[in-house]
Amino acid sequence: MQKATGATALQPSHMLSVAVLISGYTFAVCYFRLFIFPHIPVLPGGDQLGFATQGARIISGQLPYRDYFQIVPPGTDLVYAFLLRAFGVWTWIPGLVMACLAATVAVLVTLVSGHVMQGSDVALPGLLIAGFVLFSSLDATHHWFSTVLAMAAMMVLLDGNSNRHLAGAGALCGLAACFTQTKGALVLAAFVAYIIWQSRQTQVPGESWRKCLLLCAAAATIFGLANAYFVFAAGIRQWLYCVIVFPLLYYPGPGLNNWRVVGQELAADGPIWRWIPFPLLYAIPLVYVVFFLHLRNNRKRDPTQNWDKLLLIALTGTAMFLAVASSPSVKRLSTVSPPAMILLIWLLGRFGRTAAKLKIVLGVGAIAVAVAGSIRAQTRSWSFLDLPAGRTAFKDVAEYDEYRWVLGHTHPGQFFFGMPLYFPFRMRDPAAIEGLDSSEYTRPEQVAALVQALEEHQVPLLILGVSKKYPLDTTSPRLAPFRDYLFQKYRLIKTFATGNECWARIGSWQIGSSVNRDYDQLSRATP
């Protein structure tokens, strides 16, 4: 263990206590940023709304790949479906899920740190996650679910490589792949590399193949069992297209899904404090490079370090990073950062007093950022609406006005097209897709199916996103059928301050109807 620091190793019971404390702290930080005390949720946003909406589609009898489009395995959809079935469709669900995911990551990170660090250092990676990593990544999507499972699998291998440990780690990799297929597969590959490396150190090369086979068999079994029903329902060809072919060929089309996202985020408008997590997150690959160089130069010179466990952490983290390397947005980097935070603190303890002081600065800074963010969320001005999915807090006035208008002009259960309004208003998407894009991400057959669904269900209202997200004026031929249908069957009735446009179906929308009069009364009664 890390004797050079002069710190003492924590007893297992003390280690667990520290992990629970860091977890509780992380949960509180997230809760006070995502809820207005005591229990009013801030309007959820981001990709989590898509998964929550798909969970609602499952409990209504629909299935991914067959009835709606999905490019990842169904793990996240199923979690939301279970929660919505148990508690109902409420806007507090995504926020509470995110707080629980963050708390779980904090526990795992702290316990992993206890394998390779001593003293107060074991708490620092968890503090970095609560302060810097979660700063702009409170989005409960498949990325966080698969990270929790990948970290849990790594924990199992850190405790040993017996058949029981290998089967458990493999099963968790298979489960991680049920949320993010690339992360689960790459982490499994990292474990295989680790086992082969270990066997070469122990001079038992033949044993490694048996262990690798057990590991991979456990992963494949869990993944196969979890996905079999959906493969059967949609057909193997459709499942392969959605989960493998589409992500490889068409997912990188939008700038958000490729390397251009880095430039977009750096050039985006926003408050200066949005830059706080950028240096730490963009340094993730550098952390791994420095560690591997340090490993090569010092492994034989310093036998006091547990290099096997450190290598496993580094290989796992590198695999997780590679899963998002083609589209390294801040949110995605945040979800794969936990192993890097552990190695960063460990490395800082190896490079002299100045680096050791930097650990203190990072820890204090992380606490300050986390606490300040929570206080800011609780003390700023909020607007509130009683949406069909529950009372919800709004920080953006333009967004509040748009949602208030929609509240007065729609009703739960109606067909409607336009993310992200399905979930908070409990409305139904008539199509297999949730939106359109000018890139190759939107396929011609999806556009044709959307037009058919709008006509079949006579959808009364569409809310189309701002121009940078919704390419209404594009010359892309794949969107021409929708554009022609829109201009023929709908008319623009309102442009919101957000830039979003509301289109009403000609003949099915009467200005001055009862729902409009109800909204007018609501507008006068609501400050």
What are these regions, as identified by a protein language model?
Residues 131-134, 166-181, 187-195, 220-224, ...:
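Membrane-interface alpha helices of multi-pass inner-membrane proteins
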Residues 185, 319-321, 325-356:
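Hydrophobic/aromatic-rich transmembrane helices and adjacent perimembrane loops
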Residues 71, 383-384, 392-441, 450-474, ...:
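Short periplasmic/luminal acceptor-recognition loop of GT-C membrane glycosyltransferases, typified by
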Residues 137-147:
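Short acidic/glycine- and proline-prone juxtamembrane loop motifs at membrane-interface regions
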Residues 38-54, 65-79, 89, 234, ...:
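Extracytoplasmic catalytic/substrate-binding loops of multi-pass membrane glycan-assembly enzymes
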Residues 151-168, 176, 201-203, 273-275, ...:
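Membrane-interface transmembrane helices that cradle and orient dolichyl/undecaprenyl
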Residues 96-117, 152:
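Transmembrane-helix motifs of polytopic, lipid-linked glycan transferases
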Residues 109-134, 147, 164, 168:
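Transmembrane-helix signature of polytopic, membrane-embedded enzymes
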